[in-house]
Each structure stands twice: as C-alpha cells, then as structure tokens.
Amino acid sequence: MNNKNDIENKCLERGVRLTDQRKLIAKVMSESGDHPDVDELHQRVNKFDSKISIATVYRTVKLFEEAGVVAKHDFKGTKSRYEKA
C-alpha cells in the first residue's frame, strides 16, 4: 500500500467514490504528521485548492469516517480530531 496516500487506497478498497476534491483531502490527511481538526484540515487543503469549502471538508471527513478509513477522536473541551484508521 502506498503510505503517501493510504486513505485514498482504503477508500478505493471500500468502494468510496473519489472526486478530485476528495482525493486532495485524502492526500493531505494521509501526509499529515498530526491529528488535525476539520478547520486545520481545511486550511491545509486550501493551500492547494482555495475553492474547496469548509462544508466540503466536513462532508468528506464524515464520509471517510463512515467508511472506516479515518478515526474520529473527541477530547473534552476541544474540537474533534482525525487520524488514519
């Protein structure tokens, strides 16, 4: 498996349809060395494509979570953070 974009690979294995925007979000998440929240992820994705909205990032992260390719972590008093599952 290509570690550079293992989220994309897992999506393909699970039959998740990947648009160009979803591929970019998967790439940014896969290459992340930390556990970003959606706002941080949106800022990083916007460096590559400023047309991707925060709503698109939220929907995509939720889709990835439901497909079991990312894990959501809730910490008391902070925003949810995400990592590769």
What are these model-predicted stretches?
Residues 1-15:
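Short, Lys/Arg-enriched N-terminal segment that forms or immediately precedes the first helix
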Residues 31-37:
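Short capping segments at the starts of secondary-structure elements
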Residues 57-67:
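Basic amphipathic alpha-helical segments that dock to polyanions
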Residues 18-20:
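Short helix-coil-helix linker/hinge
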Residues 39-50:
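DNA-recognition alpha helix
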Residues 66-85:
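Non-DNA-binding regulatory cores of transcription-related proteins
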Residues 23-28:
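Pre-recognition alpha-helix immediately N-terminal to the DNA-recognition helix
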